[in-house]
Amino acid sequence: MLERFKLLLRDMNRGIYEKETEISLSLLAALAGESVILLGPPGVAKSMVARQLKCAFRGARNFEYLMSRFSTPDEIFGPVSIQKLKTSDTYERAVDGYLPTADVVFLDEIWKAGPAIQNTLLTVINEKLFRNGIREIELPLKLLVAASNELPAKGEGLEALWDRFVIRIESRPIRQEKNFREMLLEVKSEAGGQCSAAEGKANSNAITAEEYAEWSKAIDRIGVKEEVLDAISAIRKSLRAVNVDEAAERRHVYVSDRRWKNIMRLLRTSAFMQDRAEVAVCDLLPIYHCLWQEPEERDAIRALVIKALFAPHADKLVEMKNALAEDIKYHRIRRSPDEGRDYEGEIE
């Protein structure tokens, strides 16, 4: 299983520069049934990342839309069916080809959408359900990726939708000079991120619908070690007083109970992808992407996550450090053979 995921990630990263974190965490989210938001300036390949994710699933249907304050629910969830209104006086949407029938969804500029769209997305993301007239339909949705170059405005009731995006990633421009030059010289026909439905079907590493359903049940059976729960408790406690700025007071970073539950699903999925029957402490390393509320909190939270993971071994590390210091302080210097003896003592 691990080797297959490595090959799949290799295929998905081909022709895309420095987006390994975005793609690997998005695949993790897709297998866990969670959603991702990419934050970053325009032109940093956020949409390209989302398009590559449909390549992970054989025969996947995708839907993408650029939001604006003028976007209507019809554009996202499908127009009202005139035929249904005429023949049976039923208010239903013609959903084929729109979000309710897609496996992978990409919504750009998510915070520009109006309340009617955003409120419907709450149920879509969390329960994978969509109410179409008097019927409630189960969605085939495996992953919803949203993108924005700004955080949700405060005081406008967007906190619930923001909380639904379990993984939050800051997407940045290309930093390595070598990759930047390769990108400049790349012609359009060679560019990555243009996976077609046919390519998704042809990819032998792509995940089938049957495998996805089977793996979802297998992920539920993954165990959790006690030391993982101890580490999570330590992280949760540390979030009550995060030192973001030395000059400012420590802040309480709030993480909802629902969010912690979704994070545990990610951890189980991580263990499954690595052929393990139990979640290990190492699976916790990327969860700082799930915990921050403001971008400036990210590095501080990453540091406290690492500290919590290594805290149980701190005493042993100190003991090893002290022993090493003693070995350096006192060591044996062998003199030349004709002097006939060794010297052992403290080296100043």
What is each model feature region?
Residues M1-L2, G15-I16, I169-A248, R276-A277:
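Conserved C-terminal "switch" segment of AAA+ ATPases
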Residues L2-P41:
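Pre-Walker A (pre-P-loop) alpha-helix and adjacent loop at the N terminus of AAA/AAA+ ATPase modules
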Residues E18, S26, L38, I76, ...:
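Conserved RecA-like P-loop NTPase ATPase core
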Residues S24, L31-G33, R58-G59, L99-T101, ...:
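Short loop/turn elements that form and flank the Walker-type P-loop nucleotide-binding site
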Residues L25-L28, I82-V105:
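Conserved alpha-helical scaffold flanking the Walker A/P-loop in AAA+ ATPase domains
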Residues L27-R69:
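Walker A/P-loop
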Residues Q83-S88, V104-I117, T123-A206, W215-A218, ...:
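Canonical AAA+ ATPase core
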Residues D245-V255, K261, T269-E348:
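C-terminal engagement/docking regions of AAA+ P-loop ATPases
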